[in-house]
Amino acid sequence: MAFAGILKDAEVAAALEACKSAGSFDHTKFFKSCGLAGKSSDDVKKAFGIIDQDQSDFIEEEELKLFLQNFSASARALSDAETKAFLKAGDSDGDGKIGVDEFAAMVKA
């Protein structure tokens, strides 16, 4: 698991189960239920690095669409509406992507 040493498998599994239906993803609930919201800044930055698949120092819309698959390869892709809502929630400077500080603020919100 990509998040071994950061998150507990059981918490990740429960978080994924809670949003397995299309349209049910809520980033705030997910970050809390998987345990990321309670982690240190360093752990949140490590998580950002895993989600930032192309290592551009930003999480772009396509990476957000596949967000859940970072936690489990069998997880679903987010719908376009979920992806856009997730991006809007995290993109505080309006540049169309989420930087590490924006991600940390969203996780801790």
Swiss-Prot record:
Matches recorded under InterPro entries: EF-hand-dom_pair, EF_Hand_1_Ca_BS, EF_hand_dom, Parvalbumin
Gene3D superfamilies named among the record's database cross-references: EF-hand
Record key words, sorted: Acetylation, Allergen, Calcium, Metal-binding, Muscle protein, Repeat
Binding residue positions for Ca(2+) 2: D91, D93, D95, K97, E102
Residue ranges constituting the EF-hand domain according to the UniProt record: 39-74, 78-109
GO molecular function: calcium ion binding
SUPFAM superfamilies: EF-hand
GO terms under cellular component: cytoplasm
Xref: PROSITE patterns: EF_HAND_1, EF_HAND_2
Annotated residues for binding of Ca(2+) 1: D52, D54, S56, F58, E60, E63
Residues the record lists as N-acetylalanine modifications: A2
Keyword Metal-binding: yes
Role of this protein: In muscle, parvalbumin is thought to be involved in relaxation after contraction. It binds two calcium ions.
Family: Belongs to the parvalbumin family.
Protein name listed in UniProt: Parvalbumin beta-2
The species this protein was found in: Gadus chalcogrammus (Alaska pollock)
